[in-house]
Amino acid sequence: MAELTETSPETPETTEAIRAVEAFLNALQNEDFDTVDAALGDDLVYENVGFSRIRGGRRTATLLRRMQGRVGFEVKIHRIGADGAAVLTERTDALIIGPLRVQFWVCGVFEVDDGRITLWRDYFDVYDMFKGLLRGLVALVVPSLKATL
């Protein structure tokens, strides 16, 4: 479980929003795409800031489902907090393609409405991601350098 960091008193709304985001990220990690699909609102906006933006929960779930068996995903949530329906995460993500593991930090913003995610916006440093890629490539030759969560 992640460390819970809050700036306002915990309310049922903040607790529900945090749990919805945790359940979504865990389902994504476990390739439980039925749960992923159910977690995303129809009007979802999914954005990797500086890169792509996808509108629609079904479109996003379809994209994620297409990666099943091709791109693995692992997540470690370092901190998570909420203010009402807005949830902020500080985490490390790993993308796994065959033997290649690319691990990097991510800050995510989620908005939850009626238990479903309507906004998923991730911020990450491209240079940090590039370092993760380089480390992953070197680890293919020197396995002891493989990153772990």
UniProtKB/Swiss-Prot annotation:
Q: Can you provide one Gene Ontology molecular function annotated for this UniProt record?
A: epoxide hydrolase activity
What InterPro entries does the database record attribute to this sequence? LEH, NTF2-like_dom_sf
Known EC number(s)? 3.3.2.10, 3.3.2.11
Q: How is its activity regulated?
A: Is inhibited by the anti-epileptic drug valpromide (Ki value of about 100 uM).
Q: Name one GO biological process term.
A: epoxide metabolic process
Q: Which GO terms describe its cellular component?
A: plasma membrane
Report if keyword Hydrolase is assigned.
yes
Q: Which Gene3D superfamilies match?
A: 3.10.450.50
Keyword Hydrolase carried by entry: yes
Q: Which UniProt keywords apply?
A: Hydrolase
The reaction(s) this protein catalyses: an epoxide + H2O = an ethanediol; 5,6alpha-epoxy-5alpha-cholestan-3beta-ol + H2O = 5alpha-cholestane-3beta,5,6beta-triol; 5,6beta-epoxy-5beta-cholestan-3beta-ol + H2O = 5alpha-cholestane-3beta,5,6beta-triol
Question: Pfam families attached here?
Answer: LEH
Name the protein family: Belongs to the limonene-1,2-epoxide hydrolase family.
Quaternary structure annotation from Swiss-Prot or TrEMBL: Homodimer. Is also present as monomer in solution.
Functional note? Epoxide hydrolase capable of hydrolyzing long or bulky lipophilic epoxides such as 9,10-epoxystearic acid and cholesterol 5,6-oxide in vitro. The physiological substrates have yet to be identified, but could be fatty acid or steroid derivatives.
Q: What is this protein called?
A: Epoxide hydrolase EphG
Show the taxonomic lineage: Bacteria, Bacillati, Actinomycetota, Actinomycetes, Mycobacteriales
